[in-house]
Swiss-Prot record:
Residues 1458-1467 have a biased composition (Basic residues). This is Zinc finger protein jing. One of its GO terms (molecular function) is protein-containing complex binding. The keyword Ribosomal protein does not apply. May functionally interact with Polycomb group (PcG) and trithorax group (trxG) proteins to repress transcription. Required for Egfr pathway function and MAPK activity in CNS midline and tracheal placodes and for CNS axon development and tracheal tubule development. Required to establish the primary axon scaffold in the brain and for lateral positioning of longitudinal glia, longitudinal axons and neurons. Required for glial survival. Required to establish the proximo-distal axis of the developing leg and for wing vein and alula development. The gene is jing. PANTHER family: ZINC FINGER PROTEIN AEBP2. Expressed in the imaginal disks of the leg and wing. Gene3D superfamilies: Classic Zinc Finger. A zinc finger (C2H2-type) spans 1148-1172, 1181-1208, 1214-1238. Belongs to the AEBP2/jing C2H2-type zinc-finger family. It comes from Drosophila melanogaster (Fruit fly).
Length: 1486
C-alpha cells in the first residue's frame, strides 16, 4: 500500500472503536499501533482508547503522513513481509478504502479496544525511530517520484451497487474499484531494504507486539494465516516466517499488456474469494468479481513471485475461508465509512459493522500512494472523476472485525441503514498528489468502497472538517455539490427527482460519457437548498453512489482517451458549478470558480488569495475537468516564479447575472480538450477567481499550432460579442485584421470551439451578464479568451484565456487593486465597443483577440490597473493575449509558465485557424507583460497595440488584414493615450506615422519612441529588448525588431516586440508572415490591446528605450530566416549568458551558498559537498547550490540529496581510460561497456566503425529527441545561421591586426604628439601645442617644449582609463579601420610617416585639413580598389597611409555625427606634395 495519508487533524473518529473486538484491528490512523507503517501518530492512542466514542483528534496539523503497506516491524527478512500481513494490509487498504487506516500487520484484531491502544502505545517507542526513518524514506520516494507509477484503474466489477452483499454472497462487490499495483519494484525493493536495515528494531517491536497480543484474547498471536475465523480476533503479528519476495517489475508494453498469468502464476490460481494470501492481492481482489484468475486489464502490475511460504499461506488462507462465513469476505470488501464525528456518537455500532471481517480479504496490497501535496499532477481522470477527494483522512476509519457472524451481518445491515447519514457531505477527496502525474492512481479505495456506499473513499464530513455531518431539519443529508462527477450526479439526481425517475434510470438515459457535466445551479430546483443538494432517502443515496461510480468509470475511460488526444495535462481550468466557465485552453486553465456554492468553494473563497494550486482541489470545478491542472503552490518568494494560479474572490460587482437557467442548458458537448464550462455564468456570487499566473511562454511563438491548440482549448469561448464573426483564433487577437473578419477565415478550428463557446456566450447573454459585464468588466486584458461568457466584450472577459478564466468582472475582482469604477467605465466602454466592434471583442477567441477594446476609459483603467500588477501576474497567462499582462509577472512567469503554457498551445498549431494566430496568445501575453512594463498610459496604448500586434504575431499578418477597421475604433477610444493610429502600429508607437512597412518610418519611429519614454520592461523575460516577449516567434521578433520593432519596440519593449511582430506580418519588411505588421495588429488590437494594457500595467522595471533599440538592432539577421516562418518559441534572450547562475561555471568550484571553495577535480568537489554540505544537514534536506532549480527546496531524504548533488559535481565521474577518448560516464557499468567496446572494435579490425562503437549507445529517447534537445540548448530554438568559415577567420584576424596597429597591445594606446605651434609663456619658457596622433581621440593640448626641441611627445593611455567620449571615438575609429586594408602604419602618426619619408627632423606635418578634406573618402575607395594601392615603402605609399588614416578619422567623424551621406566613391585627390610644407616655429598652424 503506498503510503496512506493519515490526517490526524482530520478528526479521526475511530469507528473501529465502536465495536471493541474490531477496534484494535481498525487502527485509527493516528494510532501508534500502526507500526507496520512506521508512521506512528502520536495522538493515535486516544482514538483507540474509547471503543464507543469516536474521538476527533484535535491535532491541528493537516500534514499527511505517509504510511507504507509493508510492515516494518517484521523481524523476518528485510524484504519479507508476511503474506498474511501483506494481505491484511491490502485488505484494509482496499476494503477500508480511503476511510480505513491501514490495519495491516500492525493492527491486531484484539478483543478490547483498550488493549489494542495499550499495545499500540507499547509498540510506539520501539517503532518510533524506525517509523521516522521509514517516513523519511517514504516521503523522499514520493517526492522524487521514485515510487514509480501507482496506477489504479477504476473499473467497476459487475456486481457492485449493493450497499452490502447478502451474507451468503461471498463475492466481493463487483464494482469496487480495483487498483493496479505499482509498476516499479525498484522503489519497493528499496523500501524493503530499508526495512532490513531496521530489522533488529523490528524484531524488538515484534516481541513487544507478541507480548501485548498475549494480553489480549487472541487465539493465535503469530498466526500467519491472514484471516482466522472471525470469531476469534486474531492478532496478526507480522510473522517473520513469511518473507515476501521483492516484487518483480513487469514492463508494460503499450501494445501487449503482459498477461497476468504469465507474470504472476499465483494470481492465476487465486481463489476468487479474495481471501487468497497472494501478495498481489490487489489483482486477486479485482479478479474476485469476475472469478477469473486474471486481473482485469492492468498494465502495470508488480507481482511478487510465488514462494513456497506464500503458497503455504495461500492454502492456509483458503482453509480459513472455508471456515469463514461468507459474510466476512463481503464485509471486508466493503469500505468502512467512518461516520462524521457528530453522527458517530449516535450510531457507533454500525460503523464497525461495515467492515465486520477481520482481515481475510486481500485488498490491494499497494494503496494509492497519496503524496505530499502538489508533488504531482493528479491524473485527469481522477481529477475529474474523483473530485480530488481528500485522502488525508484515509487511514481514519479502522477495519472493524465483527466478533461473530451475527455481529457482522447486523453490522452490515446497520451500515446500510446508516449509509445515508455517513455520506460525507461534499467531502473532498483530495487525491492530491499521486505518485505520478502521468498515471492516474485510482482511489485505492475502492474495492470496499462501493458496497459501503463510499465509492471514492470519501471521508466523512466530519473528517473532512465539514460541519454538515448531521441531517438537516428534514432529516436530509446535504451533499455538498460534489465537484466533478459529483456535480454531474447532482444534476442527474435533480433530473431524476423532477422526472420521478430513479437515479439509475436517469443515468442510463443520459450517459455521462460526455463529461458534459452541467451543474444544475438552479436553486429553485428540487432538493437544492442553500445551494446544497440533499439526499432525501437512503435509496436515493445508494442510487447516487452507484451513479457516481458509473460516472467515474465512464469518465475514466473517456478521459483516458481524451488524455492521449489532449495535450500534456495542462492546467485544467477548474470551473466551478456556478462559475461562468470559459473553456480554457488546455495550457493553464484558469480555475474559474465563481461559484461559492460548494463547500470547496467556500474554502477557496476563504483562501481566495492563496495560490490555487492547493485551492484548485478545493474548487469544485476542478473535479469537472478531465485534466487536472498542476498548480504549483504559489511561491511568493522573489526567487520563485509567480504562482501559477492565483485565486481571488470575484468582486460582487462581477456580472453575476448569468441566469442559472442559461447555465443549466447543456452546452454542446465539449471537445475532450475543451473543458465544458460547467459553470453557468453565475458570476453573481463573488466567486473565487483562480487565474493561472503563469505567464505565457516566453515568446509566444506564433506557431500556428500552438495557437490553434489554444484556440481549440479556448474554442469554447463563444464569440463574446454578439458579433456574427466567429471567434477569431486566439492569436488573431493581436492583429488589427483580427477584427471582425478576423476569425472568419481562421475560424476553422475556432469555429469548432466556437460551437460550445456560443453557448457560453448565450449563457452570458441570458444571464444578462452582457449588459452588466460591460460595466463591471473592464476590457481587462485579463479576460481570458476562453471564457467567452463573461467578457464585457461580449464575453471577452470570460475568455478563459488561460489566465483569466472568469468573466472580466472576475478578472477585475481578481485584481482587486484595480479601481473598480474605472474598470467599470473601461469595461463599459470596452464592452460597448466590443459590442459595437464585435470584431475585436469577438476576437476574444484568440488570446490576443481577447484583449478588450481599448477605450479611452480603458486607458484610464490601464493606469488604474497599474495597481493590478499582482493581478496581472495572474492574468498574464490568460492575458497572454491581453496585452494587459504587461506585468513582468508575465515575463518572469513566462519563464515558468513558459513551458506549461506554450506546449499546450503548440499542439494545436493546425487547429488554430489563424495559423499564426495561435502562437500569438503566448506572444500577446508576453507582449502584454512587457507592454505592461511600458509606461502606463501612453505606453499602454502603444503597448496594447504592440501587444495586440505581437500576439497577433504571425496570425496577425493574416488576421490583421480584414479586421483592422474595428481596431480603429478601438484606437479612437484609445486616443487618449496615443493616437494609436487606427490600425497602424500607431497605437504602439504613438508616433503618428508608423509606416511600419517603411524601414525609414521604423527608424524614425525608433528614435521617436526611444525618446518617447522609458518603457517599463516587464522583465528580462520579455525577451530581447523586451520585444521578444511580445512576439513569440523569433522570426516575428526578428522582423519586428529589424523593421518595426523599433517602432513598436522602442515605445515599449513589449510594445516594440508586439508591434514588431505585428508590423512584421503587416510589414513587407519581414517577408515572412511572421507577425502581423504592428500597424495592422496595433490597429486592430490596439484598442483591445490598449484596453487590456490598461487593465494591467503592473509597474515594471524601467528601461531606457535606447537600450531596447540597441537590443533590437543587435538581433541577428539570421533570426529572420525561412526556418522562422514557422514560429519557434524563443526560449532565452540571446545573450543571457549568466542567467542567474552567475555566468560561466568553473569545474571544481563549489557554488554552494556561502561556499566558493576551489577543488582540483570534480571528484574532490563531490567529496567536499558530501562531507561539508550533505552530511552536515540533519534534515529537512535542501540543496543550496546557487542556481540549482530546486534551490532550498526541502526534502526529507538525505539519499535524495546525496544523489542530487552529483549533478552539481559532474555526475559523470567515470572517465574513459582509453587515450584520446574523453567520454565520461555516470556509472561504472557504462564505463566498463564502453571500454570493452574500444578493445572489441580493435580486435575485430573494425577500425572503420570503431568510432561509432566507442560511443556509448544512444538511448532511444535521446535519438528521438536529440534534434529537439539540440535546438533547445540554443538561445533560439530556431536555427542560427552563423557561417563560420575561413573567410570569417581571416576577417577576425584582420580586425585583430587592425586593432594592434592602434593599441600596440596591452589595452593601451600610445599617442605620438606633434608640436603644431609654440608660444612663450610668462616665465619665458616655451610651450608646444601638441596634436596627438592617432587623432580625434584625445584633445590637443599645450605642453612644455621638449628639451631637445624635437617637438616629439609621446603619451601612453590605458583604454580603460579613458573618458567615455574618448572610448567611443576609439570604437568608431576601429570600426572604420576594420573595413580598411591592413597597413601596419594605419594609425601611425602622419607626421612620423612624413618625417620618415621626407627625412625632415622637424617632422613636417601634412596639412591635416587639406589632406583630410581631400582624402577623407580615400579609404573607402581604397577598400574597393585595393589593387591600386600597394603598400610599398615608396613615398606614395606613405602618403596613402596618411590619407587612409585621415579617411578613418573623417569617416569616424561622420559616423559620430550620424551623417552618412558622403558619396560612396568620392574622387580621389592626390595629396599635395609634402616637400612643399616648411616647418616653422611660428604660432600659426603650419
Amino acid at each position: 500500500m503506498p503510503p496512506h495519508i493519515l490526517g490526524s487533524a482530520s478528526g479521526s473518529s475511530s469507528t473501529a472503536a465502536a465495536s471493541p473486538p474490531t477496534s484494535s484491528a481498525s487502527q485509527t490512523p493516528p494510532s501508534p499501533a500502526i507500526h507496520h507503517s512506521h508512521l506512528s501518530q502520536h495522538n493515535a492512542t486516544s482514538a483507540m482508547s474509547k471503543p464507543t466514542t469516536p474521538q476527533r483528534h484535535g491535532n491541528p496539523s493537516l500534514l499527511p503522513t505517509l504510511q507504507w503497506p509493508w510492515n516494518t516491524s517484521l523481524g523476518s527478512t528485510s524484504t519479507a513481509v508476511p503474506a498474511a500481513s501483506a494481505n491484511k494490509n491490502k485488505r484494509t487498504a482496499a476494503g477500508s478504502g480511503a476511510a480505513l487506516g491501514l490495519s495491516g500487520e500492525g493492527s491486531c484484531l484484539t478483543g478490547g479496544g483498550a488493549a489494542s491502544a495499550k499495545k499500540a502505545r507499547s509498540d510506539l517507542p520501539g517503532s518510533f525511530d524506525a517509523s521516522k526513518r521509514l517516513k523519511v524514506a517514504a516521503m523522499e520516494e514520493s517526492q522524487t517520484k521514485i515510487t514509480g507509477f501507482f496506477k489504479s484503474q477504476m473499473k467497476p466489477s459487475p456486481g457492485g451497487g449493493k450497499l452490502s452483499p447478502q451474507p451468503g454472497q461471498q463475492s466481493n462487490p463487483a464494482n469496487t474499484l480495483t487498483m493496479s499495483t505499482p509498476a516499479t519494484t525498484a522503489s519497493l525493493n528499496k523500501y524493503f531494504n530499508i526495512l532490513s536495515q531496521l530489522k533488529e528494531q523490528k524484531a524488538q517491536q515484534q516481541q513487544q507486539q507478541q507480548q501485548a497480543s498475549k494480553t489480549l484474547p487472541t487465539p493465535a498471536p503469530v498466526a500467519p494465516v491472514p484471516s482466522a475465523p472471525p470469531v476469534a480476533p486474531v492478532v496478526v503479528t507480522p510473522s517473520p516466517s513469511l518473507p515476501v519476495p521483492a516484487l518483480k517489475k513487469i514492463e508494460r508494453s503499450n501494445k501487449q499488456p503482459a498477461k497476468i498469468a504469465q507474470v504472476a502464476p499465483n494470481l492465476r490460481k487465486t481463489p476468487s474469494s479474495g481471501s487468497s494470501g497472494s501478495s498481489s492481492s490487489s489483482s486477486s481482489s479485482s479478479s474476485n468479481g469476475s472469478n477469473t484468475g486474471k486481473s482485469p486489464t492492468k498494465k502495470h502490475v508488480a507481482i511478487a513471485p510465488r514462494t513456497p511460504e506464500m503458497k503455504q499461506q495461500q492454502q492456509q488462507g483458503k482453509a480459513a475461508m472455508v471456515y469463514r462465513p461468507p459474510v466476512t469476505s463481503t464485509a471486508l470488501k466493503q469500505k468502512q465509512i467512518s461516520p462524521p464525528a457528530p453522527v458517530a456518537a449516535h450510531t457507533p455500532a454500525p460503523a464497525p459493522a461495515l467492515n465486520p471481517t477481520p482481515a481475510p480479504a486481500n485488498p490491494t496490497l499497494y494503496q494509492l500512494p497519496v503524496q505530499l501535496p502538489n508533488l504531482v499532477q493528479l491524473p485527469p481522470q481522477l481529477a475529474a472523476a474523483a473530485n480530488i477527494m481528500q485522502l488525508n483522512n484515509v487511514a481514519k476509519a479502522a477495519v472493524a472485525a465483527a466478533a461473530t457472524n451475527n455481529a457482522a451481518a447486523q453490522a452490515a445491515q446497520a451500515a446500510q441503514a446508516a449509509a445515508a447519514q455517513y455520506f460525507l457531505n461534499g467531502t473532498v477527496f483530495k487525491l492530491q498528489q499521486v505518485t505520478t502525474a502521468t498515471t492516474t492512481t485510482a482511489t485505492t479505495a475502492t474495492a470496499a468502497a462501493a458496497p459501503a456506499g463510499n465509492p471514492f473513499g470519501l471521508l466523512n464530513l466530519a473528517t473532512a472538517g465539514n460541519p454538515f455531518g448531521l441531517p438537516n431539519a428534514n432529516g436530509q443529508f446535504p451533499i455538498e455539490a460534489i465537484p466533478g462527477a459529483g456535480s454531474y450526479l447532482h444534476h442527474q439526481l435533480l433530473l431524476a427527482r423532477q422526472n420521478n425517475m430513479s437515479l439509475n434510470e436517469t443515468m442510463a438515459s443520459n450517459s455521462c460519457g460526455n463529461m458534459n457535466f452541467v451543474n444544475p445551479l438552479n436553486n429553485q430546483q428540487v432538493g437544492l437548498k442553500d445551494n446544497k443538494l440533499y439526499i432525501v432517502n437512503s435509496a436515493e443515496y445508494l442510487g447516487y453512489l452507484m451513479s457516481l461510480q458509473i460516472a467515474l468509470n465512464n469518465q475514466q475511460h473517456q478521459q483516458q482517451q481524451i488524455i492521449s488526444a489532449t495535450q500534456p495535462p495542462p492546467l485544467a481550468a477548474t470551473n466551478n458549478n456556478s462559475t461562468n466557465t470559459a473553456t480554457q485552453p488546455p495550457p493553464l486553465a484558469a480555475t474559474n470558480n465563481t461559484n461559492s456554492n460548494t463547500a470547496n468553494n467556500s474554502t477557496a473563497s476563504n483562501s481566495i488569495n492563496h495560490n490555487a494550486s492547493n485551492n484548485l482541489s478545493n474548487i469544485n470545478n476542478t473535479a469537472i475537468q478531465p485534466q487536472r491542472a498542476i498548480v504549483k503552490p504559489p511561491l511568493h518568494s522573489s526567487t520563485q516564479p509567480p504562482p501559477l494560479v492565483t485565486i481571488s474572490s470575484m468582486p460582487a460587482c462581477s456580472p453575476a447575472a448569468a441566469s442559472s437557467p442559461a447555465a443549466k442548458r447543456s452546452l454542446p458537448a465539449a471537445k475532450p480538450y475543451q473543458k465544458r464550462l460547467t459553470a453557468k455564468g453565475r458570476v453573481g456570487t463573488a466567486p473565487i477567481i483562480a487565474t493561472p499566473t503563469t505567464p505565457p511562454p516566453l515568446v509566444p511563438t506564433s506557431a500556428t499550432k500552438e495557437l490553434g491548440q489554444l484556440r481549440k482549448s479556448t474554442g469554447t469561448t463563444g464569440t463574446p460579442t454578439g458579433t456574427p464573426t466567429p471567434t477569431p483564433p486566439l492569436v488573431s487577437i493581436a492583429p488589427s485584421k483580427l477584427t471582425p473578419t478576423l476569425s472568419v477565415s481562421k475560424q476553422g478550428p475556432t469555429m469548432k470551439l466556437a460551437n460550445s463557446a456560443p453557448d457560453l456566450f448565450d449563457l452570458v447573454k441570458n444571464s444578462k451578464l452582457v449588459a452588466k459585464v460591460s460595466q463591471p468588466l473592464t476590457p481587462l486584458p485579463f479576460s481570458s479568451p476562453s471564457s467567452s461568457s463573461n467578457g464585457s466584450h461580449g464575453s471577452h472577459g470570460m475568455r478563459s484565456s488561460p489566465a483569466l478564466s472568469t468573466s472580466n468582472s472576475c478578472t477585475l475582482s481578481a485584481f482587486s487593486k484595480i479601481k473598480v469604477e474605472t474598470t467599470e467605465l473601461a469595461s463599459q466602454t470596452g464592452s460597448l465597443t466590443s459590442s459595437s466592434i464585435p470584431t475585436i471583442s469577438l476576437k476574444p477567441q484568440s488570446f490576443a483577440g481577447q484583449l478588450p477594446k481599448r477605450e479611452p476609459e480603458s486607458e484610464t483603467d490601464t493606469l488604474k490597473h497599474d495597481l493590478l500588477p499582482d493581478c496581472t501576474n495572474s492574468n498574464s497567462n490568460s492575458n497572454s493575449c491581453s496585452s494587459s499582462t504587461y506585468s513582468h509577472s508575465v515575463s518572469s512567469a513566462a519563464d515558468l509558465s513558459l513551458e506549461a503554457s506554450t506546449p499546450a498551445p503548440s499542439p494545436s498549431p493546425s487547429a488554430s485557424p489563424s495559423g499564426l494566430g495561435s502562437p500569438s496568445p503566448a506572444a500577446s501575453n508576453l507582449s502584454a507583460s512587457s507592454r505592461r512594463a511600458a509606461s502606463q498610459t501612453d505606453m499602454l496604448s502603444e503597448l496594447v497595440t504592440s501587444s495586440c500586434i505581437s500576439s497577433g504575431g504571425d496570425d496577425c499578418s493574416q488576421a490583421t488584414d480584414s479586421p483592422p477597421m474595428p481596431a480603429l475604433p478601438l484606437a479612437k477610444s484609445e486616443d487618449a493615450t496615443t493616437p494609436i493610429s487606427t490600425v497602424s502600429g500607431g497605437s504602439s508607437s504613438g508616433s503618428s506615422n508608423y509606416d511600419e512597412e517603411d524601414d525609414k518610418s521604423v527608424a524614425s519611429l525608433e528614435t521617436h519612441q526611444t525618446h518617447k519614454r522609458l518603457r517599463d520592461l516587464p522583465t528580462p523575460e520579455s525577451g530581447i529588448g523586451g520585444s521578444l516577449s511580445n512576439s513569440e516567434s523569433s522570426n516575428s521578433i526578428a522582423d519586428a525588431i529589424s523593421s518595426k520593432s523599433a517602432s513598436v519596440g522602442p515605445p515599449t519593449t513589449a510594445a516594440s516586440s508586439a508591434s514588431s511582430s505585428a508590423s512584421d506580418s503587416n510589414s513587407l519588411a519581414s517577408n515572412a508572415p511572421s507577425p502581423a505588421s504592428p500597424e495592422d495588429c496595433s490597429a486592430a488590437p490596439s484598442p483591445a490591446c490598449s484596453a487590456s494594457t490598461t487593465g494591467s500595467i503592473p509597474p515594471s522595471t524601467v528601461v531606457d528605450i535606447a537600450m531596447v533599440e540597441a537590443t533590437s538592432k543587435s538581433l541577428p539577421k539570421s533570426a529572420i530566416s525561412p526556418i522562422l516562418s514557422q514560429p519557434k518559441t524563443i526560449r532565452f534572450p540571446a545573450g543571457a549568458g549568466a542567467s542567474g547562475k552567475g555566468g560561466k561555471r568553473h569545474d571544481g568550484v563549489c557554488y554552494w551558498d556561502k561556499c566558493n571553495k576551489k577543488h582540483e577535480s570534480n571528484s574532490k568537489l563531490l567529496d567536499h559537498m558530501q562531507t561539508h554540505h550533505v552530511n552536515t544537514q540533519t534534515g529537512p534536506f535542501a540543496c543550496l547550490w546557487v542556481g540549482c532549480k530546486v534551490y532550498n527546496k526541502e526534502s526529507c531524504s538525505r539519499r535524495w540529496l546525496e544523489r542530487h548533488v552529483l549533478s552539481h559535481g559532474g555526475s559523470k565521474q567515470f572517465k574513459c581510460i582509453v587515450e584520446g577518448c574523453g567520454l565520461r560516464f555516470g556509472s561504472q557499468l557504462a564505463l566498463q561497456k564502453h571500454v570493452n567496446n574500444h578493445f572489441n572494435a580493435t580486435d575485430n579490425a573494425r577500425e572503420s566503425t570503431s568510432k561509432r562503437t566507442s560511443d556509448p549507445p544512444v538511448p532511444k529517447q535521446l535519438r528521438k529527441n536529440g534534434k529537439k534537445l539540440r535546438y533547445r540548448r540554443q538561445p533560439f530554438s530556431a536555427r542560427m545561421f552563423d557561417f563560420f568559415d575561413t573567410g570569417i577567420m581571416e576577417g577576425l584576424q584582420h580586425r585583430l591586426r587592425q586593432i594592434s596597429t592602434l593599441t600596440n597591445g596591452a589595452q593601451a594606446i600610445e599617442f605620438q604628439g606633434q608640436c603644431m605651434m609654440r608660444r612663450r609663456n610668462s616665465q619665458g619658457g616655451y610651450e608646444c601645442f601638441v596634436r596627438w596622433s592617432p587623432r580625434e581621440i584625445i584633445s590637443d593640448e599645450w605642453l612644455p617644449e621638449c628639451l631637445n626641441r624635437t617637438r616629439q611627445h609621446t603619451k601612453v593611455l590605458h583604454i580603460k582609463q579613458m573618458r567615455p567620449a574618448e572610448k567611443t571615438r576609439v570604437d568608431s575609429l576601429l570600426s572604420t579601420a576594420f573595413r580598411l586594408r591592413y597597413d601596419s602604419h594605419l594609425f601611425a602618426d602622419d607626421y612620423n610617416v612624413n618625417e620618415q619619408q621626407v627625412g625632415e627632423a622637424s617632422g613636417s606635418d601634412c596639412d591635416e585639413d587639406g589632406d583630410g578634406d581631400q582624402e577623407e573618402e580615400d579609404l573607402e575607395d581604397q577598400d574597393e580598389d585595393e589593387e591600386e594601392d600597394g603598400s610599398s615603402s615608396s613615398r606614395s605609399a606613405s602618403c596613402e597611409t596618411v590619407s587612409s588614416y585621415q579617411q578613418v578619422l573623417s569617416i569616424a567623424k561622420l559616423q559620430m555625427q550620424q551623417r552618412r551621406k558622403h558619396p560612396r566613391k568620392p574622387p580621389k585627390v592626390t595629396p599635395p606634395a609634402r616637400e612643399k610644407l616648411v616647418p616653422t616655429d611660428a604660432l600659426v598652424p603650419i
